[in-house]
Amino acid sequence: MAKKKTNEQPSVKEVPKPAEGEVICVVKKMLGAEHVQVICLDGKERLGRIPGKMKKKMWVKEGDVVLAAPWDFQPNKCDIIYKYSESEVRRLEEEQVVSADIIEQLRG
């Protein structure tokens, strides 16, 4: 029996962009216990928390670009929502959501 031919197009996944109340950050330091220190594009340094539903699926390391949601009641803390891959960071740069120079400065 012959194999069925499929004409599947490679699906292009939509890159999440920061909504209202969200900011793009770069991981500066791993602190342990699912906490990281991040530098955000708004110029603030925050303590980020990786939620339990993401900590096993998403491995975060220093220098990664992440999407974070600052807390309303403690603006110096945030939750990590999404980790961008290198190709997604390039796509954000192409769409002019963030510039490559700023990302490189934050990565140090």
Curated annotation (Swiss-Prot):
Transmembrane segments: none
CDD domains for the chain: S1_IF1A
Gene3D superfamilies according to UniProt: Nucleic acid-binding proteins
One Pfam entry name: eIF-1a
Biological source species: Sulfurisphaera tokodaii (strain DSM 16993 / JCM 10545 / NBRC 100140 / 7) (Sulfolobus tokodaii)
HAMAP family: aIF_1A
Function, in words: Seems to be required for maximal rate of protein biosynthesis. Enhances ribosome dissociation into subunits and stabilizes the binding of the initiator Met-tRNA(I) to 40 S ribosomal subunits.
Family of this protein: Belongs to the eIF-1A family.
Keywords: Initiation factor, Protein biosynthesis
Molecular functions per Gene Ontology: RNA binding; translation initiation factor activity
Name this protein carries in UniProt: Translation initiation factor 1A
